[in-house]
Amino acid sequence: SPEDIVGMQVSQGILTVRGGMTSHAAVVARGMGTCCVSGCGNDNDVKIDEEAKTFELNGHKFVEGDWISIDGSTGNIYGEQVATVAATGNKNFNRFMGWADAARQLLVMTNADNPRDAQQAVDLGAEGIGLCRTEHMFFAEDRIKAVREMICARTVEEREAALAKVEPFQQGDFEAMYRIMGERPMTIRYLDPPLHEFLPSKDEDIKELAADMGMTFDDLKNVVASLHEFNPMMGHRGCRLAVTYPEIAAMQTRAVIKAALNVSAETGYIITPHIMIPLVGEVKELKFVKDVVVKVADELIKASGVDMKYLVGTMIEIPRAALTAGEIAKEAEFFSFGTNDLTQMTFGFSRDDAAKF
């Protein structure tokens, strides 16, 4: 949820009861560079009292202000402040990787969702960004309200007005990232998670948001309820959102193309935006969203008078997409593999629960 992301961003470490090494919390924390131990027990082992701000673990009670130390490599938890040593470079490792660099032919890229991540990626030698998850940009405090207005919109006009508030933020982030990446490739994935993830679930949080947005509690509660899904991972998300609300894809395309044009004019970099449409299951879905992207992008590029190239591809993360990849390839200009969802849907495992058995 948005509250989880904001909390994770300001945390020095993350400890969760549920999940495992491959759960969403662990993956996001790893991307943030934040120490995380995910899945430290079950509800019987760990008792959390949010109101009192305490938790019990293996018979030990911790209150707000107490120190604990966690080791993200081993999963160990220490009930005290443990002295730490800053990580240092390994000469033997660096030497070995130098040999690998001399022999390899593949580019080694990274995930980065904001300018800070992009700068760190370049500093550590990344040759591009293989995945920029645009929804993480939506969670920032200065733009989440506009995103929520878009979700609660009742008409296309209301939705477009809210998206117009989000667009400058997205464009600004993309411009900053393009300046950092230079001519290195950057693949930008369009909005992927279901919309309910941007709204609160607790009544007290819904009341607070309703007052902030000028809505009644009941109206906002109904919006939240209407977005509820029994299995959101397989629900209204990814390209399905763009099919239902093409104005979202249009806004994101404007932000990407304008950012690339501006930075290219400013720096002289030859930038080729890579636009990724997520969760495609068959070629008709990709073509529908691609047509929206191409129309908006071509109009902006023509108006600029610059001959800028761009690519539109997709992520293969549904078994049906893998089976019909030959058809999808007729429309896609590149593929990326989303191994998290593809593995879960192929084997019927949940990455949040598989570690238990």
Regions found by a protein language model. Give the residues of each.
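Conserved alpha/beta-domain cores
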Residues: 89-357
